[in-house]
Design a protein with these regions (language model features):
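Phosphate-binding site recognition
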Residues: 1-350, 454
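A cross-kingdom feature that marks ATP-driven nucleic-acid transaction machinery
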Residues: 314, 318-482
């Protein structure tokens, strides 16, 4: 079955504009591994490349150059393989070949570019020379480079301070699917999943197209999850190590950080994280955190305080929290890494267990955080400046916390409660009292003078009863799919 391009309308429109411009373009496309970058580019160009190659992971300069030579030979149709001792000569040969082509746009696509930049290879200076001394002087070259190592792409191309400084004409990030795009995908491939099941799928693996492509429409969601993660021959059983090793050269440091963060849902301060991960509080540790953030595995946020400033640099604050937000990584640590059950049908048999319900509640909170723009739209505050954060009582005996609050510039705070249920959520007398106490403690400790709006986000809405009036605003899961 032919693969279809789902969503990506904005990204496709931009790529087409760049490709059809009247000047040479240097375009960097980046994003998390398995997110569909290469597929998007191939669809945009319709595989009409003047030259296309993919870098090799974990090999030295010599083999990378041989790989380049083989790719070039496919386009030149030469009967002999031309070999190169340096990247400077390799790119010169590419320019010589391109000059033999007829008039018209010439798309050069180099995939997994970061893998080609091996130690002391001279790759970046050669790429700089290729662009600065040849490609930019023409008006028909469309150089598209792509990579999953997001931190490399940002630091070596987008923020380059050498020969490529300000030479990149465009950069485009390809993000995971939203819930809406996941729904489009499942409809296009004739899956009969409900929105609740699509949300649960997202809570397991995020909106990663590659993972979705491995699912079988003839199986239930639970069966698919078992097949991908828990079966004896599960295709994604080793995905965790493969993922981090492909993205980071010293992946052990990054794995140590996410391992520590997986133990604390709300996140850790830098000092807590240094201690928990066994790292050292230095520049190298800052680099690891920055790379994880750039790749979308963690986020930085500031716990709620009346002293919060919406324009200040969060990285300079001691109370900044680092939180693990990658769905697959969270699922891995909770269920896969220490799967003591050794049950190939583990997920199917866990659907009504307390283990499942606890996970679903926490993961739904992360799903809401991931779709905060949809929540703001549903609240009618898309244009209002906000801080999205959490709060925990300083009184350890009370143990009161709010996992999601939206601190608004219009002197209002949405206190969000998130509930993932199979039917309408019903507020009991006990839960109403708990909510009132939470609001009282929050107001008392924070001394906030802002208005508080209790906001309930549920899978199927709120059941009306004599306790439901405590909620000022409710949002259903459907509004996250818009």
């Amino acid at each position: 079955m032919e693969q279809r391009l789902i969503g990506r309308e904005a990204e496709l429109k931009l790529l087409n504009e760049y490709i059809n411009s009247n000047r040479s373009e240097f375009i960097a496309v980046y994003g998390r591994r398995r997110v569909g970058k290469t597929f998007l580019i191939r669809k945009a160009v319709e595989d009409h490349f003047a030259f296309f190659m993919t870098g090799m992971n974990g090999v030295a300069k010599g083999e990378q150059l041989v790989n380049f030579s083989i790719s070039l030979q496919k386009y030149t149709h030469s009967t002999t393989l031309q070999t190169f001792k340096s990247w400077l000569l390799a790119f010169y040969a590419l320019s010589q070949y391109i000059e033999t082509l007829p008039e018209g746009k010439k798309v050069i696509f180099i995939d997994e570019l970061p893998w080609m930049d091996t130690a002391k290879s001279g790759f970046i200076p050669a790429l700089e020379n290729f662009w600065n001394s040849w490609a930019v002087l023409r008006n028909d070259i469309k150089l598209i480079v792509c990579g999953s190592a997001t931190s490399w792409m940002i630091n070596n191309l987008i923020r380059n301070r050498g020969g490529l400084h300000n030479r990149l004409t465009h950069h485009l990030i390809v993000k995971p699917f939203t819930l809406h795009e996941c729904e489009e995908y499942f409809k296009a491939y004739h899956f009969g999943y409900s929105r609740k099941q699509i949300a649960e799928c997202y809570m397991v693996m995020g909106g990663i197209p590659y993972y979705l492509s491995m699912m079988d429409k003839s199986k239930s969601l639970a069966q698919n999850i078992d097949q991908l993660f828990f079966a004896d021959n599960a295709e994604l059983k080793d995905e965790f190590n493969d993922l981090y090793r492909a993205l980071f050269k010293k992946s052990a440091d990054h794995i140590a950080v996410v391992t520590a963060l997986a133990t604390k849902g709300m996140g850790m301060t830098r000092q807590e994280l240094v201690k928990a991960s066994g790292g050292k509080d230095n520049g190298a540790f800052s680099t690891v955190l920055e790379e994880l953030e750039q790749c979308g595995f963690i986020r930085l946020y500031e716990p709620f305080s009346t002293a919060n400033k919406m324009t200040s640099d969060i990285r300079q604050k001691r109370n900044t929290l680092f939180q693990l937000v990658d769905f697959y990584t969270l699922f891995y640590f909770r269920f896969i890494k220490h799967n003591k059950y050794q049950d190939s049908s583990f997920w199917s048999s866990s659907q009504n267990s307390q283990l499942y319900h606890t996970w679903a509640g926490l993961s739904f909170e992360m799903l809401c955080l991931n779709h905060i723009d949809k929540i703001k739209h549903a609240l009618g505050i898309s244009g209002v400046q906000t801080l999205v954060c959490s709060w925990r009582s300083s009184n350890t005996e009370k143990r009161t916390q709010i996992d999601l609050l939206i601190d608004r510039k219009d002197e209002t705070i949405n206190i969000c409660e998130m509930k993932f249920y199979k039917s309408e959520f019903e507020i009991s007398k006990e839960y109403e009292e708990k909510l009132l106490e939470k609001l009282r403690i929050f107001t008392e400790e924070t001394k906030t003078s802002k208005s508080l709006l209790l906001t309930l986000i549920t899978s199927f809405g709120l059941k009306q009863n004599k306790h439901s009036d405590i909620v000022q605003k409710q949002i259903t899961m459907d509004e996250l799919f818009i």
